[in-house]
Each structure stands twice: as C-alpha cells, then as structure tokens.
C-alpha cells in the first residue's frame, strides 16, 4: 500500500474519466472509481464500484467500509433528464446533488481516520453564468459575491466547509468552463456532439459546414488539465480550503472549432451556412447504427448511451449570439490558481485535435482513412 488512496466519484463523467486515467497511471496511488456505470475508457489498475449516490442505505454500506481512503475527487453531478438547463435552478435538483455528497461523505469521514483532502469540481454557474438575463461581470473572479439563487454549488461548499472546521483535512473547489473530454454518455460533452456530427457528415459524403454570425468567445477547460489540478490540490498548501477557476489558459471562439475538426477528420470543410447543429445532426442519426457495425466501433448504437444529455448543450456550437453577448458568459480569470502554483495549460486548438484523435483511438468515431 502506498498510503494514498483516492476515491474518484463520478468516474464515468468527463472529469472523473480523466482523473481515473491520471491517478491510476501513477505507482503511489490506490484508486477506487465510483459511478453508476463503468467508465468508457480502460480503468488500468483502478477498481470500479457501481454506486447510486442517491441511495443512502447503499452509501452507508459501501462508504462506511472505506476507512483507508485518504483523498476524494468529487466529480459527480445529477442532471435533470429531458430539461437539463431548467434543472440548474431547480430546488429539487439542488437537493439531489446535496444529498449525493452527504450520502457519500458522512459515512466515509466517520471511519477514514487518515483522511486528508477532498476536491469538488463545480463550474462557472457559481457566478450565475446560467442566468441569461443577468449582466455578467468580465472576467469571473473567485472574489465575486454569491448570486442569490438556488445553486447546489453553494450548498456543497458550505457543507464541506462546516465539516472541515477544526479538522486536519482540507478541501478545494474547482470552477472550470465548457469541459472537453473523452467520456461517452456524459451529460455535458459538447465536443463529442461536434465529433459525431462531423463523422455523420463525412459518412454521408457531405462537407462540414461552418456557422455564420457571431461566435461566442469563451474559456475552455480540458478534462485532462482539470485532473492535473485535482492532483495538485492533494498536496499543495495554497490549495487548502479555497476555490479556483481552472481553464486552458487561452480564450477560444467556438466557430473556430469547425475547420480544426474538419482537418482532424480529413474531411471537406464547407462554406459558411445558417444552420443549427442539433437539427442537422438528427437528420443523419439514422446512419449511426450502421456506422457502429461497419467500422467496429466501441461506441453504443443507443443515442442515450452515446450522448447522455449532451445534445442539450451541444447546440452552443451554432447558437445565435448577439454581437454584444459574445463574451458575456464564459470568461474567467485564472490569476488566482496561477499565483497559488498551478501552471498547467494547453492551447485549445491543440486540445480539440487531441480529442478528435482520442475519439478515433477509443473507437468512438471511425478512424481516418
């Protein structure tokens, strides 16, 4: 035993998947991955335990027996099926997410006598980025006051802060924007939506069109980079009991992704068109089951298993944006985390190329001929 055992919660999601890969690849960590379904990517040396975090009895049985856990990377979130965006301000949905954390942590902290740290992955909704009629500050900074509204991020932060008072262990909260990763079936993987759309267009013999109009300019967060942040927080003194924005380090115009994807998949880049990506993708979805069989893909034929609720956020690639709004919703300062000692970064264009390659390597989309 290394003496360091991390519980990665929400292991089948974007950040959880990346965290499992990172920690399981290191010799000094024992890794337990927790999620209702197994991660799509190989687990390596990690052990997967299927748990429903809303089942308090199951959680008491499972986590009450984990006295050797020293660290937690909490990446889990429960989204409202069928109307994910509406759920972001729903008190019932907030209550579910608070219950999930409590169901896990209460029994675990009672038995984990060498517990050292918990990280929680939140996001820019901590600043009200999902409340569309607000005037947004630019950039979002960790010092901004809370927005009076129903937000489980606040409940979870207050909970771990109260639990930690007077204890030797510590907590860290991360706030990324628009996460990119290689999880399949995740609820927030807009990059998978774009990749599948491009693959369908290529299979149909069609070019990848480019959106017209103004493009949102936003921060992006690579799930692999967030996993590095989770690793950093396990040991960094300046990460203790604090919150940090975490981003790639540049800003990105969403429409610029289309030529990058076309080049990555060796397909024709079309002209600029007035279109919406989700309706156009749905017109071609009848091709998908045949593509899975034709190319021997590991990706599921079932659309719910493939996308989760990601189609709801995937429309952002072509969403009409008023020119005055292009920088309103997704720009955050990363000065605080840099000054605290975390300096990892990645060019977002390179990140997109990486995931287009990785989707092929994992058998999510057809390989480039």
Each model region followed by its residue ranges:
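Glycine-rich "substrate-gating" loop/helix at the edge of Rossmann-like oxidoreductase active sites
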Residues: 145-149, 177-190, 211-224, 250
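N-terminal Rossmann NAD(P)H-binding glycine-rich loop of SDR-like oxidoreductase domains
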Residues: 3-27
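Mid/C-terminal beta-alpha module of Rossmann-like enzyme folds, strongest
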Residues: 229-320, 325, 330-335, 339, ...
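NAD(P)H-binding glycine-rich loop region in Rossmannoid oxidoreductase-like domains
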Residues: 39-103
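Conserved Rossmann-fold NAD(P)-dependent oxidoreductase catalytic core, especially the SDR/UDP-sugar
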Residues: 72-74, 85-152, 172
